[in-house]
Amino acid sequence: MVLIALVFGPLPAYSHSQHGDVGNSPKSKKDLLRIGATVYKHMCVFCHGQDGNGGGDAMAYLFPWPRDFRKGVFKYRSTPFGSLPLDKDIYRTITRGVPGTAMPAWRGALSEDETWGVVEYIKSFSKRFTKDKPKEQIALGEVPVTDSESIKRGQSIYQEMRCSRCHGSDLKGDGPIAADLYDIWDHRVFIYDLTDPNAFKFGFDKKDLFLIMTTGIDGTPMKSYNHLNDNERWDLASFVESKINKEIYKPAQYESDLNTHVIDGEIDTDPENPLWNSVAVQNIHTLPLNARRDPIDQIQFQSVINDEGIAFRLQWEDAQPDRTSSRHQDFKDAVAMQFALGKVMLHKHGHNEPFFGMGNRNKVVNIW
């Protein structure tokens, strides 16, 4: 799919990543709550809602739906099944985002104090954090070497544990009961393709796989497999890791400066114009609004500018054509570009920029 757009006046854009490191903040809890409330109301409320119920204005367009923080149930943790997460677990999710969903990585957009502030503010939505304490972090120990024997043992365990009922015999997420699964919020569960490294929400290294098998994913049908001994879980992790096509992993920077190429000639809207052959291509990592097979997770960006206007050429791979749409909530094959208007400082802390999901009141955007 190739699309070219011609507009007047260059403006910046940015994309999101999956990377982040756990830090710390010396500020008091009171100060962090104040900071976190400000950030949450500017950056998070549109999806997660005013009271953290996951019912923000953007919810209708998203699947999976945003997390409801009020129950105090968190999917991705380093603590045992049923336990509250550690603060650093929530921090990790905020900074790294949740691949395969609309939850972006906020590292680079938020300072450490702001991120820790959001951690504290999220915890304030659930009474569990005032009544309970997180259990101790699961100790991983030394990661054993993967060999053909451990993979073979892991495959046997995969079959014995009937993992294929959900994940499919080839780990593509098409098991016989995959379409009939729901979480505790009564939301339908989407089973991702485990051969795709871009679909893993908590990491796809062997230690990450071992950890998720040990903790389970709270609130979902994915239970903990801690009834297996450590060696069995490591073998199962070896088998799953052996099926991951790591060559198709597409890392991205949190924010990308998108550059335009100055030309002297005229600009037309023909995407096959030879002028594009000499224009550098930049890759933008995209976030799917709705989980689906073969999502569009990367767009190739090019731009040229002259004295009269600016043009963009965008290309992406899409195996299934969708040229028409009969419902407003469905989308045909197309692309939209969003430009912040007014005096906006992107790439700066302070959050002067509009909400990236089509802007917000008093901070409008121009959408092409």
What are these regions (language model features)?
Residues 106-153, 169, 239, 317, ...:
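Extended surface/linker regions that mediate inter-domain or inter-protein docking
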Residues 283-368:
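Surface-exposed, glycine/proline- and aromatic-rich loop segments on solvent-exposed faces
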